[in-house]
Amino acid sequence: MAPDQSYQYPSPSYESIQTFYDTDEDWPGPRCGHTLTAVFVNNSHQLILFGGSTTAVANHNSSLPEISLDGVTNSVHSFDVLTRKWTRLNPIGDVPSPRACHAAALYGTLILIQGGIGPSGPSDGDVYMLDMTNNKWIKFLVGGETPSPRYGHVMDIAAQRWLVIFSGNNGNEILDDTWALDTRGPFSWDRLNPSGNQPSGRMYASGSSREDGIFLLCGGIDHSGVTLGDTYGLKMDSDNVWTPVPAVAPSPRYQHTAVFGGSKLHVIGGILNRARLIDGEAVVAVLDTETGEWVDTNQPETSASGANRQNQYQLMRRCHHAAASFGSHLYVHGGIREDVLLDDLLVAETSQSSSPEPEEDNPDNYMLLDDYLMDEPKPLSSEPEASSFIMRSTSEIAMDRLAEAHNLPTIENAFYDSAIEGYVPLQHGAETVGNRGGLVRTASLDQSTQDLHKKVISTLLRPKTWTPPANRDFFLSYLEVKHLCDEVEKIFMNEPTLLQLKVPIKVFGDIHGQYGDLMRLFHEYGHPSVEGDITHIDYLFLGDYVDRGQHSLEIIMLLFALKIEYPKNIHLIRGNHESLAMNRIYGFLTECEERMGESYGFEAWLKINQVFDYLPLAALLEKKVLCVHGGIGRAVTIEEIENIERPAFPDTGSMVLKDILWSDPTMNDTVLGIVDNARGEGVVSFGPDIVKAFLERNGLEMILRAHECVIDGFERFADGRLITVFSATNYCGTAQNAGAILVIGRDMVIYPKLIHPHPPPISSSEEDYTDKAWMQELNIEMPPTPARGESSE
C-alpha cells in the first residue's frame, strides 16, 4: 500500500493560448476524438494533430453529445510550438481512411496510427506510419495474426521498443486483449498473456508509457457501462506483468487523456457518467509514479485563488479531447463540453515542486525529465538504405539534456512498501544483473570514483593476456557504469568541440566492439600506461567504438577510464555510431541488455549515450592535420566545426555536424565534386578537388578520417592528402580486412601499423568458419556497408 502521507503538488495552471494560421485550411478548427502527438523534427518542436471529428451530435442515452461520424476526417495539422502557428500537412503515400477514437504513438519521427472508427464502422487494424521527415504515410504490413479492428483503445511505445495495444471496442463488444510488436524485429504482433492482476476489458481509457518502459493504464468504461477508476502498470519484460496501483484515484473517468510531465502522470478531464463531466478538483488528477500516490494538487485558498481555481475547473471540463507534452509543458486541444465542440489549445507548465522526503527504496528521490525534451528525429543509416520498419523509423533522441530513465524506481518499488504487500526488495546494496533469470551482484560503490576507474583499467587493460570472458555478464554494475560516466562527462564538457593536439600521437580508426583487436594493437604497438608509452605519446580515437562487435562495453568503459586517468593524453572524438539512433539498432543496446540485465542494461545504455552527446567532434594536429570521423562533406570550414554547440544531436543539428560524422570521399580520385552517398538521404561524398580546396582554404596539409572499412587497414585519397584508417579486422566477420593505426612522429611523418585477421581454426574450413567476435545474426540481418572500393551485391 502506498504511504499515507501526502504532499503538496500545485496543479499546473492551464491557459488558452493565441494561435496563428495562414489559411482556414491550416486551422484544425473544433475537433473531438482526435490525437495530438509531440515530435521534434526539422529543427522544430511540433504538435501533430490527426483525425477526429469536426462535428458532434446529441446522444439520446446521455445529456452529453457524442462524436458525429459524418464529420470524421483524416486531416493532418502541425502546430509549431515556437511560432504558435498551425499548418495543414498533406502527406503522400498510403493515406489512412478518415477516423476518430483511434490511437497514436511516437517512434522517432514516425507517428504511428492504429484503429479508430469512421462512417462505415471500425477502421482497419493496420498500423499507419506518418514519416515526418519525408511527409509521407507508410502502411506497415506484418505477417501472422494482428490486432482486430477496434476503437477507443490505448496504445503507446513501451521502453522505446514495444508497440503495445490494450482493449477497445470492435463494434460489437469490448475487448480485453493485450498485443505487442517488437520494433527491433521480427515484425509480427504477439498476443500477450501477461501475468499478475490483469485489468478488465474497457474502452475510452488512457495509456501512457513512462521513460523506463512501464506502460500505465488509467480508467475507462467496461462492458456493463461502469466507469472505472483503477490504474495498472504493465512491465514489458520476459514475464509481461500487470501490476495494479493500490492508491485510489480521485475519480473514475473515461474519454479523458493522460500525459507525463516528468515522473508525474497528469490525468485530464473525462466523463464521470453518461450525464456528467468530471469537474471540481478532480478535473486534473496527478499520479506521482515515484511514490504511487495521487498527490494533493490543492493549495491554501484565498478569495482570488478560489475564483481562479473555479475558472480552471471550468476550463478543463471536457471529454474526447487530445493532449501531449513537451518536457515540462502540457498541451490540451479541443474536445466536447456539454453542447460545445471546442477548438482551443491550452498549455500549462508543470510544477517543479519536489517530492516528499525519500523513502528507503528510493534514497536519492530521483526525478525524470523535468524541463528536458524527449524527441526523436530520424537517423541516418550507416549502412545502405533498408526497407524494414526498424531502419526507417529508429531515430536519434534530441533534447536539451538527456533525461535519466534510471532515476525511476521499478513499478513494484513505487507502488508497494513491503514484502507483506507484494514487493520483496533485493538485499541491501545489491542489484539485479546479467540475464533475466535474476542473478544478483553486490554493488561495490564504497570505493571512490577514482578507485573505480583504476579498477576498470586494471581489469581490462591486458594487452598480452585478455581473452573473451566465458561468462557474458559484465563485471561492472549499473551504478558503477553511471559513476564512471558522470566523471568522464565532466571532462568532455570542459573540452572544446575542436581539440588542439600535439604530436607524437597514435590515431585509431573504427573499433566497433572488437576489444580483442584493440588489445592486439596495444600489445603490438604500445599501450597507454606508465609501463607502456603514455608518457611520451598521445592517443586519439576517431569514433565508432560500439556496435556490431561483441565487446562494446569493454571498449567504451576502458576508454572512459583511460580518459579519467590521462585526461591530457587520451583523446576521443565522436563517430556516427555514438548516438542513440544508431547503437539502438546495430548491437550496443542489445549487448547492454544481455550482459547487464534488461532494465539495468537499458539504463546503462542511456547513460553512456548521454556522454556521447558531449564528445568533441574533431581534432587539429599541430594546426596542420584535421582529424574527423567521417569527412568534410560539402567542404565545411574549421570555424564551422568549432562553433558546433554541445551536447550535439546528429540529424537535428547543422549540416556541418552531419557532414563530419557521415560523409565519405568519392570512390577514387577520378570522381570529382559533391555526389550523393548510398548511406542515406542528405549524406554526400566529396571528391579530391573538394579536399584540395578545403585544405587550401583552411591552411591545412592533410585530413585523417575513419568511418569506412578499408581492406589494407588504411587507404590514401586525393594524392595522399586524405587517409582513411580502420582499426577492426575482418569487419563483421566477412571483409577479411586488416586493421591499422597511424603513428605520427614529431617530424609529422605518418607510419601505418597493421594487424591482420586471425586465421580460422585448423579444425574449421574457411567457408564454414564464423568469427564469434562479431554479432553474426545482426550482421546478416543488416549487412554492413561494403569495404571501400567494393560494391554491394
Curated annotation (Swiss-Prot):
<feature type="repeat" description="Kelch 4">
    <location>
        <begin position="264"/>
        <end position="314"/>
    </location>
</feature>
<feature type="repeat" description="Kelch 5">
    <location>
        <begin position="329"/>
        <end position="388"/>
    </location>
</feature>
<protein>
    <recommendedName>
        <fullName>Serine/threonine-protein phosphatase BSU1</fullName>
        <ecNumber>3.1.3.16</ecNumber>
    </recommendedName>
</protein>
<dbReference type="InterPro" id="IPR011498">
    <property type="entry name" value="Kelch_2"/>
</dbReference>
<feature type="repeat" description="Kelch 1">
    <location>
        <begin position="53"/>
        <end position="109"/>
    </location>
</feature>
<keyword id="KW-0539">Nucleus</keyword>
<feature type="repeat" description="Kelch 3">
    <location>
        <begin position="214"/>
        <end position="262"/>
    </location>
</feature>
<dbReference type="InterPro" id="IPR015915">
    <property type="entry name" value="Kelch-typ_b-propeller"/>
</dbReference>
<feature type="binding site">
    <location>
        <position position="576"/>
    </location>
    <ligand>
        <name>Mn(2+) 2</name>
    </ligand>
</feature>
<dbReference type="GO" id="GO:0009742">
    <property type="term" value="P:brassinosteroid mediated signaling pathway"/>
</dbReference>
<dbReference type="Pfam" id="PF16891">
    <property type="entry name" value="STPPase_N"/>
</dbReference>
<dbReference type="InterPro" id="IPR004843">
    <property type="entry name" value="Calcineurin-like_PHP_ApaH"/>
</dbReference>
<dbReference type="Pfam" id="PF00149">
    <property type="entry name" value="Metallophos"/>
</dbReference>
<comment type="subunit">
    <text>Interacts with CDG1, CDL1 and ASK7/BIN2.</text>
</comment>
<keyword id="KW-0880">Kelch repeat</keyword>
<keyword id="KW-0479">Metal-binding</keyword>
<feature type="binding site">
    <location>
        <position position="510"/>
    </location>
    <ligand>
        <name>Mn(2+) 1</name>
    </ligand>
</feature>
<feature type="binding site">
    <location>
        <position position="707"/>
    </location>
    <ligand>
        <name>Mn(2+) 2</name>
    </ligand>
</feature>
<feature type="modified residue" description="Phosphoserine">
    <location>
        <position position="764"/>
    </location>
</feature>
<feature type="modified residue" description="Phosphoserine">
    <location>
        <position position="444"/>
    </location>
</feature>
<comment type="similarity">
    <text>Belongs to the PPP phosphatase family. BSU subfamily.</text>
</comment>
<dbReference type="Pfam" id="PF24681">
    <property type="entry name" value="Kelch_KLHDC2_KLHL20_DRC7"/>
</dbReference>
<feature type="active site" description="Proton donor">
    <location>
        <position position="577"/>
    </location>
</feature>
<keyword id="KW-0464">Manganese</keyword>
<dbReference type="GO" id="GO:0005634">
    <property type="term" value="C:nucleus"/>
</dbReference>
<keyword id="KW-0677">Repeat</keyword>
<dbReference type="GO" id="GO:0032880">
    <property type="term" value="P:regulation of protein localization"/>
</dbReference>
<dbReference type="GO" id="GO:1900459">
    <property type="term" value="P:positive regulation of brassinosteroid mediated signaling pathway"/>
</dbReference>
<comment type="function">
    <text>Phosphatase that acts as a positive regulator of brassinosteroid (BR) signaling. Dephosphorylates BES1, a transcription factor that regulates the expression of BR-response genes, thereby playing an important role in the regulation of response to BRs. Inactivates the negative regulator of BR signaling ASK7/BIN2 by dephosphorylation at 'Tyr-200'.</text>
</comment>
<dbReference type="GO" id="GO:0046872">
    <property type="term" value="F:metal ion binding"/>
</dbReference>
<feature type="binding site">
    <location>
        <position position="544"/>
    </location>
    <ligand>
        <name>Mn(2+) 2</name>
    </ligand>
</feature>
<feature type="repeat" description="Kelch 2">
    <location>
        <begin position="110"/>
        <end position="160"/>
    </location>
</feature>
<dbReference type="Pfam" id="PF07646">
    <property type="entry name" value="Kelch_2"/>
</dbReference>
<feature type="binding site">
    <location>
        <position position="544"/>
    </location>
    <ligand>
        <name>Mn(2+) 1</name>
    </ligand>
</feature>
<dbReference type="InterPro" id="IPR006186">
    <property type="entry name" value="Ser/Thr-sp_prot-phosphatase"/>
</dbReference>
<keyword id="KW-0597">Phosphoprotein</keyword>
<dbReference type="GO" id="GO:0005886">
    <property type="term" value="C:plasma membrane"/>
</dbReference>
<feature type="modified residue" description="Phosphoserine">
    <location>
        <position position="395"/>
    </location>
</feature>
<feature type="binding site">
    <location>
        <position position="512"/>
    </location>
    <ligand>
        <name>Mn(2+) 1</name>
    </ligand>
</feature>
<feature type="binding site">
    <location>
        <position position="629"/>
    </location>
    <ligand>
        <name>Mn(2+) 2</name>
    </ligand>
</feature>
<dbReference type="InterPro" id="IPR029052">
    <property type="entry name" value="Metallo-depent_PP-like"/>
</dbReference>
<dbReference type="GO" id="GO:0004722">
    <property type="term" value="F:protein serine/threonine phosphatase activity"/>
</dbReference>
